[in-house]
Each structure stands twice: as C-alpha cells, then as structure tokens.
Design a protein with these regions (language model features):
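PIN-domain endoribonuclease scaffold, especially VapC-family toxins
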Residues: 2-4, 23-93, 103, 107-111, ...
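Conserved glycosyltransferase catalytic-site signature
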Residues: 8, 98-99
Length: 137
C-alpha cells in the first residue's frame, strides 16, 4: 500500500470540529485509501494544538492506536540531519516537526505529503526535491 506523510495541520483539523479545514480533512481521509505516516514531533504538535480538550487529545491517540496512522522510526542518528535542515531553512523557518517529516521522506522514500502549510514547497530533501502536497486547500 502506498503511503504519504501527514503534517499536524490536517490532523488538528480532523479532530477540531471548529477548525476551518475540518470538513476538508474529513473528506480527504475518507477518500484517501493509502497509508499515513508521521513522526512523534508531529503527534506532539497536534496534541498540543488540541489541548483545549483532554478528551479530544485522547480520541486522537486512540485513533493512532487503532491504526489511523503509522509512526516513523527516527532516533538520535537523525539529529545531525534535523540540525542541518533547520539551519538550511532557518529563514522560513523550519520547526522540528517539519524537519522530522523531511527526514522521514528521505528515509522512507516518500514524495507526497498532506499539509495545510505551503512551506513544503520550499523545503527540499537530500535529493533537492520538494514534497508534493496532495491536501486540498
């Protein structure tokens, strides 16, 4: 099964019914038949943005537990690359979650992402390629 990366924006929208992208996120995930891959940094960012409700945060974690998405394996061996990316794109700027998604795209050879952010058209992976954003905005 083909997988794409997913950023915090669509995940926040999926679990926050008052988010302007909520219905877009729901429809996107209903129509998308592939796998979703993200990082712990994205999960942390999403959970923080859902802090208006502990029950919504728990619903998000249960959704992951049920297989809503898979978590990429990043470890301390990736820190050099995270630093390099953060320095390279410091003018954008690139946060840890975004850098972790670029590193994941390199490690898992994934070229597509679902994101609300336009920054992924600026960021480049180690092969100087940007991620194609397939989330409708």
């Amino acid at each position: 099964m083909k997988s794409i990366l997913i950023d915090a924006g669509p995940l926040i929208a999926l679990f926050n019914k008052s988010d302007q992208y909520h219905s877009t996120a729901v429809n996107f995930l209903q129509d998308y038949s592939g796998g979703l891959l993200t990082t712990w940094a994205v999960v942390t960012e999403t959970s923080h943005m859902l802090s208006f409700s502990t029950s919504v945060q728990i619903d998000f974690l249960k959704w992951i537990q049920r297989g809503g998405l898979k978590l990429a394996e990043l470890d301390s061996s990736h820190i050099d690359r995270l630093i390099t990316l953060s320095q390279q794109f410091s003018d954008v700027p690139m946060d840890l979650a975004d850098a972790s998604l670029i590193v994941t795209s390199e490690n898992y050879k994934i070229g597509e992402i679902a994101s609300i952010d336009s920054d992924f058209y600026i960021y480049r992976n180690i092969r100087n390629q940007f991620l194609v954003n397939i989330f409708p905005r």
